[in-house]
């Protein structure tokens, strides 16, 4: 059996038995960057108005309960998780519990003692997001000096220590012109990089408008930005029309996220459907969360849509863009249409073209 097939089998068995195969711990809302499109970053005063960060002991307790459920993968994120003073202690504890730990980071602080920690207790993976191809772009997007210089230096140091970072570029209107430069840098250093342009409007405590930063991935522009990337032309998944709205989400039923203030959600982009692991315990909270998620209805517009097999119809995206889980947003509909056209060898001539035969 191939590894991909084996992984699908494990995920299916976990979903059938309601076992969380993996979890995300959002350790903090704080960050050393101040990215203008971030959905979570808070100042200390803002965070105090929203709640309290979980203590070291609370995170250890949650991790112990998570371990007892059979969870294997543990993703650590923030904010910037490594800004917590107790990060080294928590990280080492999670590793020693037997979790396959992944770290998401902006990469700026992954040097010195933190690099040594990661080298001694190697994670399953380190995901580093790039925000520009120059120090100037980093300052514009993240408000940080020497960002590109420091981050790329740390990425190469991770690689030299035996940790191969997985890179992502978050594309906005402020850094899209750096895309080719970043791709070239990654290629020259034999590093894989994925492109992400689907900015989600912040709906958590870091509420702000980011419409001016979003890239309109329509028509030919989609092809220019993604070229022949497989993500554009493949089906998202095959599914029946009667399936619930989380049918396309690989995390549903097999994963959860604990937010910095102690709520259990499906992911950190879906804040309003949650349970309380601190009072219920992790297992009971996971059961309650999935019951609540199952009650969410699919938008009526999706039922007979011609593009449904090519649509990453995410309820969290619906909520952030329309304020309602049951209302679709045009940006996702357009992306699904483009995938459909590309897969069926239709030529898109203009950014605003509508094919009436397919809509």
Region locations from a protein language model:
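Conserved alpha-helical substructure of the radical SAM core
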Residues: 1-125
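Conserved short loop/turn motifs at secondary-structure junctions
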Residues: 80, 170-172, 322
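Short glycine-enriched, charge-decorated loop/helix-capping segments at active-site entrances
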Residues: 44-53, 140-146, 320-321
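Cysteine-centered iron-sulfur cluster-binding motifs in ferredoxin-type domains/subunits
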Residues: 26-34, 253, 302-309
């Amino acid at each position: 059996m191939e590894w991909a097939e084996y992984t699908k089998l494990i995920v299916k068995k976990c979903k059938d038995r309601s076992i969380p195969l993996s979890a995300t711990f959002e350790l903090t809302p704080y960050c050393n960057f101040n990215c203008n499109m971030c959905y979570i970053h808070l100042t200390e005063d803002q965070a105090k108005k929203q709640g309290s960060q979980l203590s070291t002991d609370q995170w250890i307790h949650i991790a112990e309960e998570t371990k007892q459920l059979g969870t294997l993968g543990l993703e650590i994120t923030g904010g910037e998780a490594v800004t917590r003073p107790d990060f080294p202690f928590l990280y080492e504890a999670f590793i020693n519990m037997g979790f396959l730990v992944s770290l998401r980071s902006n990469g700026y602080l992954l040097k010195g003692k933190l690099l040594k920690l990661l080298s001694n207790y190697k994670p399953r993976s380190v995901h580093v997001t790039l925000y520009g191809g120059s120090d100037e772009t980093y300052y514009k997007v993240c408000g940080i000096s020497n960002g590109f210089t420091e981050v790329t230096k740390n990425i190469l140091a991770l690689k030299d220590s035996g940790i191969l970072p997985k890179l992502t570029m978050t594309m906005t209107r402020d850094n899209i012109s750096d895309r080719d430069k970043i791709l070239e840098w990654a290629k020259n250093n034999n590093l894989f990089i994925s492109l992400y342009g689907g900015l989600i409007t912040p709906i958590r405590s870091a509420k702000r408008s980011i419409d001016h930063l979003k890239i309109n991935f329509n028509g030919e522009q989609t092809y220019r930005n993604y070229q022949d990337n497989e993500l554009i032309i493949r089906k998202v998944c095959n599914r029946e029309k009667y399936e619930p709205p989380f049918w396309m989400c690989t995390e549903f039923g097999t994963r959860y996220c604990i937010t910095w203030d102690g709520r259990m959600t499906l992911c950190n982009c879906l804040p309003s459907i949650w349970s309380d692991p601190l009072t219920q315990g992790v297992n009971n909270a996971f059961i309650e969360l999935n019951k609540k998620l199952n009650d969410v209805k699919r938008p009526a517009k999706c039922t007979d849509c011609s593009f449904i097999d090519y649509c990453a119809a995410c309820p969290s995206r619906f909520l952030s863009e329309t304020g309602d889980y049951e209302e679709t947003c045009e940006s996702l509909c357009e992306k699904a249409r483009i995938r459909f056209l590309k897969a069926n060898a239709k030529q898109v001539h203009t950014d605003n073209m509508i094919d009436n035969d397919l809509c």
